[in-house]
């Protein structure tokens, strides 16, 4: 199999990278109608598999779970989750032949083996669904020409898919049809019905492409969503302790600080996040973020370049073939860091203190979000898609750190995201340690900014620059479709 993206000519690559359209709510008047009365079989019962299935069943669809024979016989976690929630469970051979739609929600590294097992069992004219297109785009999986291939990709972890549905809402979602596999022209109808069954149509749906979803998703998770949070956590913790902060306080400020800071980001973008700072602190955070952007642009560009060329995926798949030797080694290294092993802190940190004592963290968030967005757009990815893959998902990932630090983040995200996270942070940490962290001044981290001198013209210009950045312009529009977003952050 060959990387699908690399088989396209330049015009085709640009067309698929740039495919992104915000769908009107009127396009979902039929909601789940196209799949009513049809058999939907989900392969895999992890976070996405279980929670999407629960939503789809509650939306009136016929859902069953196909699991490997060994998983059923040994009553593994996937079998227990499916049966405890009252779903029909069977082997591939029992359930796949009767399915109108087979949804593959197993981890990326299992996709090829799963598809090779289920494809011969699928009836003629059935549909195959994904929630991430890496198997199609990067691996280059070849699907039978009579099979329709679609994607519904929620822009959040599976648990959030379920929680928002229970609230009568949903999560923003990308949908797509693989242009090589839409023999009956029904792919979009299938994808729309599946998305509606998860509740996505109530939060906003983007019609995209497999290519755009994969390339933007990889870029977001490697840089701002996971890589920058990991690098920032390690750097900021070490800096706080080196400056005399109590290790427990330093750990808590970082662990809960990302979540608290990005909650403002979720509700009002970079503008609101920066507005939570005093004016002197805002000016300082802006200056720091500009320094970070200049310093880190080549690193962000390299990640985007390696994603576009397929270099990233080929390296990761080589590690799959080597039993995840690199991934598991990097995971162990992270578990041994000072931040991960910092003591608990019983003291109270107020919500505002996370901002006042975390000016550098705010600057890191601003720089990372803007850089990821800018480079995706420069590469041909449409602004709406770049927004969802940078700013929108960040509070959800930050929330995982608040639970069990970096360990929890790396458990919740996919192995693909975790592998890319380590590639980024392993370069970012020494780069910033050598060229940036030593230039910090009092008030950047762990203490409030004390300089109260304000230049009105400078403040005016900074506010204008923040509010008119392209990610803020598109973000205001997209957040208008998500007026019922619940508050995540609780602080500590």
UniProtKB/Swiss-Prot annotation:
It catalyses: (2R)-2,3-dihydroxy-3-methylbutanoate + NADP(+) = (2S)-2-acetolactate + NADPH + H(+); (2R,3R)-2,3-dihydroxy-3-methylpentanoate + NADP(+) = (S)-2-ethyl-2-hydroxy-3-oxobutanoate + NADPH + H(+). Residues 209-344, 345-485 form the KARI C-terminal knotted domain. Its cofactor is Mg(2+). One of its GO terms (cellular component) is cytosol. Belongs to the ketol-acid reductoisomerase family. GO terms for molecular function: ketol-acid reductoisomerase activity; magnesium ion binding. The keyword Thylakoid does not apply. The lineage of its organism: Bacteria, Pseudomonadati, Pseudomonadota, Gammaproteobacteria, Enterobacterales. Mg(2+) 2 binds at residues 217, 389, 393. The keyword Manganese does not apply. One of its GO terms (biological process) is isoleucine biosynthetic process. PROSITE patterns: KARI_C (PS51851), KARI_N (PS51850). Signal peptide: none annotated. This is Ketol-acid reductoisomerase (NADP(+)). Binds 2 magnesium ions per subunit. Residues 15-208 form the KARI N-terminal Rossmann domain. Mg(2+) 1 binds at residues 217, 221. NADP(+) binds at residues 45-48, 68, 76, 78, 108-110, 158. Keywords: Amino-acid biosynthesis, Branched-chain amino acid biosynthesis, Magnesium, Metal-binding, NADP, Oxidoreductase, Repeat.
């Amino acid at each position: 199999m060959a990387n699908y993206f690399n088989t396209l000519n330049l015009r085709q690559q640009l067309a698929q990278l740039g495919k992104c359209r915000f769908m009107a709510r009127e396009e979902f008047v039929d909601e789940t109608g196209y799949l009513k009365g049809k058999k939907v079989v989900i392969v895999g019962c992890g976070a996405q598999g279980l929670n999407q299935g629960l939503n789809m069943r509650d939306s009136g669809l016929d859902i069953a779970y196909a699991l490997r024979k060994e998983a059923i016989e040994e009553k593994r976690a996937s079998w227990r989750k499916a049966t405890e929630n009252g779903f029909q469970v069977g082997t591939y051979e029992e359930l796949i032949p009767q399915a109108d739609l087979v949804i593959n929600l197993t981890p990326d590294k299992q996709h090829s083996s799963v598809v090779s097992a289920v494809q011969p069992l699928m009836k003629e004219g059935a549909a195959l669904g994904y929630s991430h297109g890496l198997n199609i785009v990067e691996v280059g999986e070849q699907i039978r020409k009579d099979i329709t291939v679609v994607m519904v990709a929620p822009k959040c972890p599976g648990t959030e898919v379920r929680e928002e549905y229970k609230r009568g809402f949903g999560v923003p979602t990308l949908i797509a049809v693989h242009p090589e596999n839409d023999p009956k022209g029904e792919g979009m109808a299938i994808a729309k019905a599946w998305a509606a069954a998860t509740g996505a149509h109530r939060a906003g749906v983007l019609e995209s492409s497999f290519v755009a979803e994969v390339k933007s998703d990889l870029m977001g998770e490697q840089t701002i969503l996971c890589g920058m949070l990991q690098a920032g956590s390690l750097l900021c913790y070490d800096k706080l302790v080196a400056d005399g902060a109590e290790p427990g306080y330093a750990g808590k400020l970082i662990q809960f600080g990302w979540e608290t800071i990005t909650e403002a980001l979720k509700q009002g973008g970079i503008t609101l996040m920066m507005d939570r700072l005093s004016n002197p602190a805002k000016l300082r955070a802006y200056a720091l973020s500009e320094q970070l952007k200049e310093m880190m642009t080549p690193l962000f560009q390299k990640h985007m370049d390696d994603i576009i060329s397929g270099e990233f995926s080929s390296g990761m798949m080589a590690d799959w073939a080597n039993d995840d030797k690199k991934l598991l080694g990097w995971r162990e290294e992270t578990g041994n860091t000072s931040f991960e092993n910092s003591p608990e802190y019983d003291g109270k940190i107020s919500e505002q203190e996370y901002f006042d004592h975390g000016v550098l963290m705010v600057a890191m968030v601003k720089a990372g979000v803007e850089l990821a967005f800018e480079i995706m757009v420069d590469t041909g990815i449409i602004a709406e898609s770049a927004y969802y893959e940078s700013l929108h998902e960040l509070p959800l990932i930050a929330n995982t750190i608040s639970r069990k630090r970096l360990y929890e983040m790396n458990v919740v995200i996919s192995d693909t995201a975790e592998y890319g996270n380590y590639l980024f942070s392993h370069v970012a940490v020494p780069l910033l340690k050598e060229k940036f962290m030593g230039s910090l001044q009092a008030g950047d981290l762990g203490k409030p900014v004390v300089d109260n001198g304000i230049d009105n013209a400078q403040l005016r210009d900074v506010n204008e620059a923040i509010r008119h950045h392209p990610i803020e312009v598109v973000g205001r529009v997209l957040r208008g479709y998500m007026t019922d977003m619940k508050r995540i952050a609780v602080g500590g």
